[in-house]
């Protein structure tokens, strides 16, 4: 019999703000079906105060088992695993970024979403979980380059791909050798990407990340001074959680570097966790000469999020890009 537990914001997320209409995780989780596909999940299942099956989202082991079950059931990803302490992302929210990104491409292509291997995406900071390339290739058939500065993250991602040959054929992993750079050293001279995506480090230091974790646990009523706390709800290593100057500095650096690749990328995009960082980023992009800057709002349960997208291509350049790279793609009308 699952044991009862206190509520968690993610546990009832589906009764709050909706996910993207194409998100596979609309509706409530079917735990019996998840357990049938991944029996190891059963020992982590609990009853929430509403009498429904859930897991303790503050338990990294439970979240990892839950993610493994979701990835196997919905995305045909086998033997997914990450080292202890690495970021274990919430799958529905990561999928939403990709679906809204597909909408952005569709809005740039007469309402038709381009699918298939002709489109290439660069995932900056792919992490040990390799989550965006896995979901993006499954949902839209895009090819990905997953980049990271951490060798252990890339080794973990490589192990996932080795267990999933179908994905490995479409996903290339690259190491960024210089942690001070983002696009430099990753994008080749004649290389083109239809989109970039990124989940930037949120904090400015390990101490700040730990304080943020303690605040979240206190709000959940779970703060136990004798317990070793995972960083945030889903773990995470240094480069995944913090960088010098925090999110604002990272976004500023990304904006500056993007200018050098203005004609090699159609849409640059990045998540922005702190809404207060939006005005400076938008102003900087205008100064750098971006021809189109968009803020795409998203919502997963009680959490509000957004990503910023920008391009330096003018209308003529965009038409030429679409004609050269997207006309042969499989096309899907927006809203389907």
From Swiss-Prot:
This entry's Enzyme Commission designation comes to 2.1.1.181
Could you say which enzyme class this protein belongs to? transferase
Q: One biological process GO term for this chain?
A: rRNA base methylation
Could you give one GO CC term from the UniProt record? cytoplasm
User: Could you tell me which residues belong to the region Disordered?
Assistant: 1-24
Select a single GO molecular function from the record's annotations and give it.
23S rRNA (adenine(1618)-N(6))-methyltransferase activity
Gene3D superfamilies reported in the protein's UniProt record: Vaccinia Virus protein VP39
Instruction: Name where it mostly resides.
Output: cytoplasm
Task: Identify its protein family.
Answer: Belongs to the methyltransferase superfamily. METTL16/RlmF family.
Provide the protein name. Answer: Ribosomal RNA large subunit methyltransferase F
Q: What is the organism of origin for this protein? A: Pseudomonas aeruginosa (strain ATCC 15692 / DSM 22644 / CIP 104116 / JCM 14847 / LMG 12228 / 1C / PRS 101 / PAO1)
Which gene holds the coding sequence for this protein? rlmF
């Amino acid at each position: 019999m699952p044991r009862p537990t206190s509520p968690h914001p993610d546990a009832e997320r589906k009764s709050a703000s909706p996910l993207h209409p194409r998100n596979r995780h609309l509706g409530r989780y079917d735990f019996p079906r998840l357990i049938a596909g991944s029996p190891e999940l059963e020992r982590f299942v609990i009853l929430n105060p509403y009498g429904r099956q859930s897991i303790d989202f503050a338990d990294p082991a439970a979240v990892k088992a839950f993610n493994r079950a979701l990835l196997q059931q919905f995305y045909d990803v086998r033997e997914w695993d990450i080292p202890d302490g690495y970021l274990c992302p919430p799958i529905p929210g990561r999928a939403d970024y990709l679906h809204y990104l597909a909408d952005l491409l569709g809005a740039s292509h007469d309402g038709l979403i381009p699918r298939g291997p002709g489109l290439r995406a660069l995932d900056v900071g792919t992490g040990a979980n390799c989550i965006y390339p896995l979901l993006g290739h499954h949902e839209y058939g895009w090819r990905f380059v997953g980049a990271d500065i951490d060798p252990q993250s890339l080794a973990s991602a490589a192990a996932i791909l080795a267990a999933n040959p179908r994905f490995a054929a479409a996903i290339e992993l690259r190491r960024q050798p210089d942690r001070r750079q983002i696009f430099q050293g990753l994008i080749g001279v004649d290389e083109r990407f239809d989109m970039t995506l990124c989940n930037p480090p949120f904090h400015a230091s390990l101490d700040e990340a730990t304080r943020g974790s303690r605040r979240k646990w206190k709000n959940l009523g779970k703060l136990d001074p004798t317990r070793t706390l995972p960083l945030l709800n889903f773990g995470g290593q240094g480069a995944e959680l913090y960088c010098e100057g925090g999110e604002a500095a990272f976004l500023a650096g990304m904006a500056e570097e993007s200018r050098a690749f203005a004609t090699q990328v159609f849409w640059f995009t990045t998540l922005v966790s702190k809404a207060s960082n939006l005005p400076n980023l938008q102003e900087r992009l205008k100064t750098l000469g971006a021809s189109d800057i968009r803020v795409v709002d998203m919502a997963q349960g009680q959490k509000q999020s957004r990503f910023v997208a920008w391009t330096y291509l003018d209308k003529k350049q965009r038409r030429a890009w679409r004609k050269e790279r997207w006309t042969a793609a499989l096309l899907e009308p927006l809203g389907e």
